[in-house]
Amino acid sequence: MAAEDPATRRVQVAEHPRLLKLKEMFNSKFGSTPKFYVRAPGRVNIIGEHIDYCGYSVLPMAVEQDMLIAVGPVKTQTLQLANTDPLYPDFSTTANNICIDKTQPLWHNYFLCGFKGIQEHFGLTQLPGMNCLVDGNIPPSSGLSSSSALVCCAGLVTLTVLGMRLSKVELAEICAKSERYIGTEGGGMDQSISFLAEEGTAKLIEFSPLRATDVKLPSGAVFVIANSCVEMNKAATSHFNVRVMECRLAAKVLAKHKGLQWDKVLRLEEVQSELGISLEEMLLVTEDALHAEPYSREEICKCLGISLEELRTQILSPNTQGELTFKLYQRAKHVYSEAARVLQFKQVCEAAPDNAVQLLGELMNQSHRSCRDMYECSCPELDQLVDICRKFGAKGSRLTGAGWGGCTVSLVPADTLSSFLASVHEAYYQGNMSRLAREKHSLFATKPGGGALVFLEA
């Protein structure tokens, strides 16, 4: 496992068109030369959706698209942020007075999350100012983790300016925790793969303690990303945080049903650990203990033996106070079955049978069905795109990322890649002008990329 510090690499900026362009724009904007550059990649989750925050392992890989920041420390305490994309306005604040507005998921707030995470980790009251120019080529709100990549990039920028050191694991944990400043209750997958990724391999990411294991993907097949072009801004919607709460409530009701100390339980994985049984057995417990009809707040209170006031003040998060019903059975069933699929996927990759691509594809298809029917995080466009991808030769296709929009990931035999891309282009993008305009960043094959690092000009 890569537990060491993020790498620092010396580069000839003139030989890298994107770095050179960023350097020139930085100079034009701030009247000085960047001291260093930091990049942090986006990711595609191959399998294991909505289970990291329930305590279960996931199987992502870094994509080649990333966030890239040019940085120039300054002698004042002013933090100045600019973006190469004019859609994202400049922002300036005092480095020692960072305020993050949860109600406004504006681009600079994700930078501030990473900055503040490092500040709080070291207990610093005085921070140096800096000029930063951000350049991202991860499609925003696409489920490829552009926002978390920006948080990670900002964390590594801040650490580098301070001249301090942390391991990749520590950085991932700090950035996962600090993204919650903006109201996103994620589980840590996005930040972990952004730091722990290595070129040429996917990773099984496990939590508590955080660790990453190489997973060699089968030769003869490629992963293709296709963007539905339906944007989903994770922090601006209640869907995601309601699912987090439904999983937490399901864990508590299951724990109470099995006579465990339910009030200490937060995650579905904890119930399985406490009972010491397999995922398959947990699915049977779920069938036995939970019903398919939505639970009202009153019924949850009755199950747990608590008052409505206790439910509101001790369990429900601020952004789920208005919810009247919760689907516990469906969410628990998705989580336990998806966690099992992740382990099966890894086992197939390790055993590498002749029909590995077929087996992995079927696991991806099962995952999408569960996301659509049990977790209800798909949307009509994603379902249509998945169907198109399967129709034109993908062995497996599923939504990736939070869902409710964003991207699909498909497993495609390498020898059919060209015809697959042409067919999907024609069926999903060609007849729709807004999709067609974004297609360059919406349909592409990808291979596992490397993790976050610092560039110094040679």
UniProtKB/Swiss-Prot annotation:
Signal peptide: none annotated. GO terms for molecular function: ATP binding; galactokinase activity; N-acetylgalactosamine kinase activity. It is an enzyme of class 2 (transferase). GO terms for cellular component: cytosol. The record marks 43 as: Transition state stabilizer. GO terms for biological process: galactose metabolic process. Pfam families: GalKase_gal_bdg, GHMP_kinases_C, GHMP_kinases_N. It comes from the Eukaryota. PROSITE patterns: GALACTOKINASE, GHMP_KINASES_ATP. Alpha-D-galactose binds at residues 43, 49-50, 52, 190. Its EC number is 2.7.1.157. Keywords: ATP-binding, Kinase, Nucleotide-binding, Transferase. ATP binds at residues 143, 145-146, 233-234. The active site is at 190 (proton acceptor). It catalyses: N-acetyl-alpha-D-galactosamine + ATP = N-acetyl-alpha-D-galactosamine 1-phosphate + ADP + H(+). The keyword Cell inner membrane does not apply. Belongs to the GHMP kinase family. GalK subfamily. Acts on GalNAc. Also acts as a galactokinase when galactose is present at high concentrations. Monomer. This is N-acetylgalactosamine kinase.
